[in-house]
Regions:
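A short, conserved structural fragment
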Residues: 341-355, 543-551
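C-terminal accessory/connector segments of nucleic-acid motor ATPases
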Residues: 236-253, 257-262, 296-336, 347-348, ...
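Short acidic, hydrophobic short linear motifs in intrinsically disordered regions
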Residues: 309-322, 348-356, 509-521
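Intrinsically disordered, low-complexity regulatory segments
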Residues: 1, 8-13, 17-191, 200, ...
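Short, hydrophobic-biased segments on the C-terminal half of alpha helices
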Residues: 334-338, 537-538
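Conserved short loop/turn motifs at secondary-structure junctions
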Residues: 52, 133-134, 210-214, 302-311, ...
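Phosphate-backbone binding and catalysis cores of DNA-processing enzymes
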Residues: 69, 117-151, 157-304, 405-462
């Protein structure tokens, strides 16, 4: 198939989508193992019968419901539920020949019936619109939908919108375009690149270090950042040092609480900074001299300082701020933002209340700017409205400026009104987005800074205070910093001290990265894109490379082994500069500046040579150490092996003999009591990690997860006990905390709401968003 260069001869209408196409260059379709048709200029309506509906294909069911609510009976809206086809799950899925990359795409089993339904609807539709998300991922999903429908992109109008509102949907229908094949190629290059790295390198890691490990272009760069910080922390050598503080008062009658703490900044022409005074004796000698000095106010410096209003959110800053202020993980933030974008209940029915949430742009539509300024004028006050709208520009290369920043879609839907429609977490995130957008268009805050210098014969002390003169954007965001007010001083004024003392301090190691901190670093280095930050952190946690403890990402030992091997043999994979440069090339593909296969081959050729060489040259860390003992089952020698959870002893004749020696270990006790037999519970280890087991095993085989189940603020409908969130091999379920006395259980998330028909408990529907179902009578409530 040939890539299309579309020449629009007339304005595209919703009912007739016509385009003239010509061959431009070999592209994705030519290299895809699918059944493709040639481009055609036949209109999209020529085969339809009169009275047919228009079909709109989106990604998510929630988005489909919201759009259907706006458009009515003339439109059928169906959701693809994400990618309808992808590279095969358990095979490499890419044929590489003569510098060409030919991917094989499979339609997943759970999408097969959906594709059939889409094909049937398309056959009877007047026009079929592709309305997947506006990023590259959405562009590629739209392309694959067209392929699955055995169509040609010239026959499928592509509509995009930054927000799911009636006006935005209507505008997009009046202004369709074609699927952008450059963006599709960029996404496919990324997908194939990630498959090449992940499939080939993960296999090598499993061969050389241990099963269940993975590597990836963005994932491994992020892990290298975390490992480097962990090395800094472990190598850190704390140092003691001394600071000298003087407690001065403006006049001798000042109260105790009015003492002002001044810092020693100079002594005998020596600048006193952190780590300058490391000797306790020297600090005490200086202290003795200072206590005999007379002091006066040498200078007073007063300055006006401006704190600029923050820009509206893009994906990375939303994730960082949500993590810091709300305690939400990046995954949770994006999940809630997705719901707010796709549609929630409002007084006017279903509507998207924020713009698209995967964006690296700071652009704001003119209409939205005008609305924000009107809101500030009428709801906050004219003193807070700047003379003109503030325009922000993203600094990173590749930022898609055609998109918008994240903002509310309707400023009349204030957080106060939204409280009646949104859940607690949805309201928290919506309020954060709403207030940040309004703040971005408000005046800057103004502070008055006051610096006072006090001199002795040999010394100089300083203190700095500040006072908020005009709150500006803090009016809506709030200001957590309290004013540090200083009393009135006069230059030359004699001043007394109440006390002078040396304070011993100790340097601290750099902190572990938080999720927000890692995202900020990845963004600053140009690693990854808005859609990759949350999944990258999630996979590092899932692979047990890091653990999240008290909001900090703690690197595990296995990560050091993985990074050491990658640094020694695949340095470019963990090199942040290389990863950022590759990201930049993907941007160039999307802008038609580079050929996608050339970029892939440039990476693939040297990479696959290293993989081939590494299979024989890289020393395995699965070294088997002899124990001198014999296997009790087959008589071969027992050896020490490295596993994911440390060393263990097994038969050297594995896999023919699968004997594993159970080492006698000190029993790790717990405070838990077995509810079945009353014996104490102990901590044991399985291949999935630690768990609680009854000390009476094998007589009592009771076992529980080590982590306490999450307690819900929902009462059991059977006995009134508290419901708990538990996990099984089949997934999450909810059971009564009074088990086994009460055996109430449900697979759907419970709520405190009651069924208006029978009074039973309402639970969230497992597949239908914004829908609840009664556990007793199965009544469905939307």
């Amino acid at each position: 198939m040939l890539e299309l260069q579309v020449i629009f001869t007339t304005k595209i209408k919703a009912s007739v989508f016509m385009a003239t196409a010509k061959a431009k260059k070999t592209t994705t379709k030519e290299n895809t193992k699918t059944s493709n048709k040639k481009a055609t200029s036949k209109t999209a309506t020529s085969k339809k019968s009169s009275g047919s509906k228009n079909l709109i294909i989106v990604e998510s069911p929630a988005k489909a419901r919201t759009i259907k609510n706006f458009l009515g009976k003339d439109y059928e809206v169906i959701a693809s539920k994400g990618h309808i086809r992808d590279l095969p799950q358990h095979r490499f899925g890419i044929t590489i020949k003569d510098k060409h990359f030919i991917p094989t795409y499979d339609i997943s089993k759970d999408h097969a019936l959906l594709v059939k339904e889409m094909q049937d609807l398309h056959k009877n539709a007047e026009v079929t619109y592709i309305a997947t998300d506006e990023d590259r991922e959405g562009e590629a999903i739209g392309y694959h939908i067209v392929e699955a429908l055995n169509g040609d992109i010239s026959q499928f109008p592509r509509i995009v919108f930054h927000e799911i509102t009636k006006s935005a949907i209507t505008h997009s229908l009046d202004n369709p375009r074609l699927i952008d094949m450059d963006r599709v190629n960029a996404q496919q290059a990324r997908r194939l690149l990630d498959r090449i790295v992940g499939f080939k390198l993960s296999g090598l890691l499993s061969q050389k270090i241990g099963r269940g490990l993975s590597a990836g272009r963005v994932q491994s760069s992020a892990l290298k950042i975390l490992v480097d910080r962990e090395k800094e922390i472990r190598a850190f050598n704390p140092q003691d040092y001394f600071l000298i503080e003087a407690y001065f008062v403006a006049d001798s009658k000042a109260k105790e609480e009015e003492k002002l703490v001044f810092d020693l900044v100079r002594f005998k022409d020596k600048k006193i900074e952190k780590l300058v005074l490391q000797d306790k004796k020297e600090a005490e000698e200086i202290l003795a001299i200072l206590q005999k000095e007379k002091f006066r106010v040498e200078s007073i410096q007063q300055k006006e300082r401006v704190t600029k209003s923050p820009p509206p959110f893009m994906t990375s800053t939303l994730q960082q701020t949500s993590s810091n202020l709300l305690g939400f993980s990046p995954t949770k933030t994006m999940s809630i933002a997705q719901k707010l974008y796709e549609g929630v209940k409002t007084k006017d029915g279903l509507a998207g209340v924020i713009t698209y949430m995967r964006t690296d742009s700071l652009n704001i539509a003119k209409e939205a700017l005008d609305n924000a300024r009107e809101f500030i004028l009428t709801s906050i006050g004219k003193d807070y409205l700047p003379s003109k709208a503030k325009i922000y520009t993203a600094t990173q290369k590749g930022a898609q400026e055609a998109h918008e920043a994240i903002r509310p879609t309707n400023l009349s839907f204030t957080p106060q009104i939204a409280a009646g429609y949104l859940s607690n977490d949805e309201l928290k995130l919506y309020t954060l987005i709403f207030n940040r957008f309004i703040a971005s268009q408000m005046k800057d805050a103004i502070f008055e800074s006051l610096s006072v210098s006090v001199m002795g014969e040999l010394s100089e002390f300083k203190i700095t205070g500040r006072r908020l003169v005009f709150d500006g954007f803090y009016k809506i965001l709030g200001n957590a910093d309290k004013d540090k007010l200083l009393p009135q001083f006069k230059e030359g004024q004699a001043i007394d001290f109440k006390d002078i003392q040396s304070i011993q301090k100790t340097t601290e190691p750099p902190p572990h990265y938080s999720e927000a901190g890692l995202i900020k670093t990845l963004e600053s280095l140009g690693i990854g894109r808005p859609s990759t930050y949350a999944p990258t952190i999630r996979i590092l946690i899932d692979r047990k490379y890091v653990e999240l403890e008290k909001k900090q990402l703690i690197v595990q030992d296995i990560a050091f082994n993985v990074i050491a091997m990658l640094e020694a043999n695949f340095e470019e994979i963990v090199d942040s500069g290389f990863s950022a440069a590759l990201e930049s090339k993907l941007d160039d593909i999307a802008e038609n500046k580079l050929e996608w296969e050339e970029v892939l081959w440039e990476f693939y050729e040297p990479f696959i040579e290293k993989i081939t060489k590494g299979k024989t040259s890289i020393e395995s860390q699965k070294v088997m150490k002899p124990t001198g003992e014999l296997c009790p089952e087959c008589g071969n020698e027992l050896v020490i092996r490295n596993g994911r959870y440390g060393e263990f002893v097994s038969c050297s004749n594995y896999p023919q003999c699968k004997f594993i020696k159970k080492e006698k270990q000190e029993v790790e006790t717990s405070d838990e009591i077995c509810e079945k037999c009353g014996r104490p519970m102990v901590v044991k280890m399985s291949k999935r990690g630690k768990f609680l087991a009854c000390s009476g095993y094998p007589e009592c085989k009771n076992a529980q997860p080590l982590e306490k189940p999450k307690e819900l603020s929902v009462a059991c409908p059977k006995c009134g006990g508290r419901l708990l969130e538990r996990k099984s091999k089949r997934g999450i379920f909810y059971g009564c905390g009074n088990y086994p006395k009460c055996k109430f259980i449900t697979n759907a998330e419970p709520t405190n709401e009651k069924c208006d028909k029978c009074g039973g408990m309402l639970c969230w529907h497992k597949t239908k968003e914004n829908t609840k179902v009664c556990v007793e009578c199965k009544n469905v409530v939307t």
